[in-house]
């Protein structure tokens, strides 16, 4: 999306005027051909990082911190969108369909915050036509690997891709002969190395005053896994009637039935 120099293409909320003017001057000094959404996202992300770092031990208000976080997340997801490989998502969907055709099932696993994502994704996939089961990664090496059978496939989630407990679980799953879809923010990690296909969910900054607590990376992993669910939904031809049958309750169930 090209933007002319006469337009005001963006607003960085939570950045004081001098920093905003510096950002605008930097972006506007770029050649017209380079003045696109991706370049602006990169500049804005840098501004957010500078502002985020300045806030540690600084005097910005909680409202300013929230506004800065909103901007940072938008920038991180925009950057991820430029890197996201549709082919990798399609490949992951293909592996799942292949395993299902052989009678296999989908398991989703992770440690820490990734465990919560795994539980959500298992539920999301199940409600959209791909039965999936949460697998506790720690319990996996203490007997729960027994829920996994030949021709199954596991989605393993780890931001670092180096979490020891998860890697131990993957080794155990590999011994059962199943395939692995990795979801990680580290393309050079051990998880990336052992996975049959890797879905990139990397971010540069988490947001917040410490820039350590998993926030943006959580959203990034959900972002790519929701995209995977969309690919499966389309390839399976999910109908409104099917969804209503699997999700009959609540306002969403009534909406699916057209009530």
Functional labels for PLM-detected ranges:
Residues 193, 207, 234-259:
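Internal, active-site/partner-interface "lid" segment
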Residues 55-62, 69, 82-87, 106-107, ...:
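Short acidic/polar alpha-helix capping motifs at helix-coil junctions
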Residues 37-39, 47, 54:
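Ala/Thr-enriched low-complexity intrinsically disordered regions
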Residues 1-42:
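N-terminal acidic, proline/glycine-rich, low-complexity intrinsically disordered segments
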Residues 8, 25-27, 40-45, 59-102:
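An N-terminal, well-structured beta->alpha segment
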Residues 62, 101-107, 111, 248-259:
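Glycine-rich phosphate/diphosphate-binding loops and the adjacent beta-loop-alpha structural elements
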Residues 97, 105-236:
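Glycine-rich phosphate-binding loops that contact phosphosugars or nucleotide phosphates
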